[in-house]
């Protein structure tokens, strides 16, 4: 039974457990419920399922560079089906002020929110165990972060250059 696709570093596409939204496949995906393209600006609510090349898939990961450099993205609500926020997935989203990280996410990848200078606070759910290298580096507007006991690894420079950070709980 085929449930999704996953892109590998060599760009060959293999069918796996779920769809990883990446910069390369993003424009080929539409919201399964509405049939409309997934927006990359404003207040975005990511769908739990998408249609990709005529087949329906559950979104399981926000992959590398999926929203990188989307300067008009202001908020994002990630569906419960997502378990990983990948490398550089939201890097350079200068106007991103709000993000909802769902309970199913276990890993926030390297550079995931790098340079999201308008992000003010982040609440990391109890399911997260790893915060990747430089995950929030350069988030100058970040004033508070809630890190649960479930996090067992905070990689090098995860919160480096967060000059406004005053509260970590």
Spans of model-derived segments:
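Short beta-strand/loop segment at the start of cytosolic alpha/beta domains
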Residues: 1-37
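Structural signature of tandem-repeat unit edges
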Residues: 8-11, 16-19, 39-61, 71-84, ...
């Amino acid at each position: 039974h085929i449930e999704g696709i996953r892109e590998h570093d060599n760009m060959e596409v293999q069918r796996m457990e779920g769809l990883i939204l990446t910069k390369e496949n993003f424009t080929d995906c539409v919201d399964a419920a509405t049939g409309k393209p997934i927006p990359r600006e404003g207040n975005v609510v990511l769908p739990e399922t998408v249609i990709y090349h005529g087949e329906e898939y559950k979104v399981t990961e926000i992959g590398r560079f999926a929203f990188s450099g989307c300067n008009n993205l202001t908020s994002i609500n990630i569906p419960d089906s997502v378990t990983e926020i990948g490398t550089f997935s939201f890097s350079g989203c200068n106007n991103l002020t709000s993000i909802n990280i769902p309970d199913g996410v276990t890993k926030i990848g390297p550079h995931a929110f790098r340079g999201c200078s308008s992000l003010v606070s982040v609440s990391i759910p109890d399911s997260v165990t790893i915060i990747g290298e430089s995950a929030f580096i350069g988030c100058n507007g970040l004033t508070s972060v809630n890190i649960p006991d479930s996090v067992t690894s905070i990689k090098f420079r995860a919160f480096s250059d967060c000059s406004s950070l005053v509260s970590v709980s």
